[in-house]
Amino acid sequence: MAWVTPNDFDGDSPLAGIDFQRALERKAYKEGAGLVPLQKYGDFKNNVKTTDLGTITTNIKGKYTLSNLNNIFPNFIVESLIEGIEAFGKRIEHFNDDDAVLSAIETRTSSPIRITRDENFNSNIKGLIPAGEGAGYAGGITSAAIDGMKIFEEIIKNYWV
């Protein structure tokens, strides 16, 4: 997974994150010519197109094509993915094998937008409190739970009599 912040893409629109996401999805579609683009991890690290699957095969459903995923992502995402895969490889045997198969692209691990809230967690409408992953304040179940706990504490403090 790669972390992307508003500083990583152009535009001041509240939907600029969605535009960035869609641009990556279009690149993946083009790279795969409508099929799922696949690449061996060793080829990904070396920025060369995969020409054959190695010792690790894929169980992906649907049609795929061998590709170069570097053509899809900006450099900061490529570097982040390599760093993350290498870190996992130190903990999980074979995770970073050169023949490991990568596919592209999953772009929805977290909300591409963030609903703004004030110091009391309210949106621009008092009492309407955006929270968790869908509101852009979490990236998974644990951080969403923590955000929910913060919101709950604020509600108790301000609304519980």
What are the residue ranges of the model-derived segments?
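A glycine-rich dinucleotide-binding beta-alpha-beta segment and adjacent secondary-structure elements
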Residues: Y64-A138, A145
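Internal hydrophobic alpha-helix adjacent to the cofactor/substrate pocket in enzyme cavities
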Residues: G17-A28, A144-V161
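Structural signal for hydrophobic packing residues in well-ordered secondary-structure cores
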Residues: K45, I85-I92, F152-Y159
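An anion/pyrophosphate-binding glycine-rich loop and adjacent beta-alpha core
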Residues: M1-N68
